[in-house]
């Protein structure tokens, strides 16, 4: 006979608007991939959701360009969690299974990802 399902317990959690973008990334990634993503976001914006590149349309935590947001089917958001989701979507499409560590390796060589 099949085993009964293990009950799932949920912790009460704050709305995403009240959660740190860095914490969301940490929850979504393996520890190794998070370390790479953290280094990358520190270099790109120091995790500043209001960061703007003076020489391009890149802005936010991931410093994504406007065309990149459009290619992802997204719009730039002032909200850091949305910016992290967009950066992770971009990294997933561009670097595949190498993920944030692939993006970080590329950044170290070229100073962009």
Regions found by a protein language model. Give the residues of each.
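N-terminal prepro-regions of secreted/extracellular proteins
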Residues: 1-11
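Peptidoglycan cell-wall recognition and remodeling modules
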Residues: 12-113
């Amino acid at each position: 006979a099949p085993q009964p399902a293990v009950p799932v317990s949920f912790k009460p959690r704050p709305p995403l608007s009240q959660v740190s973008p860095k914490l969301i990334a940490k929850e979504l990634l393996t520890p190794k991939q998070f370390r790479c993503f953290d280094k990358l976001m520190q270099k790109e914006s120091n995790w500043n959701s209001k960061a703007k590149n003076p020489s391009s349309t890149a802005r936010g935590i991931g410093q994504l360009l406007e065309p990149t947001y459009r290619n992802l089917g997204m719009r730039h958001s002032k909200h850091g969690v949305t910016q992290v989701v967009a950066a992770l979507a971009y990294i997933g499409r561009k670097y595949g299974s190498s993920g944030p560590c692939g993006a970080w390796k590329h950044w170290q060589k070229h100073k962009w990802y």
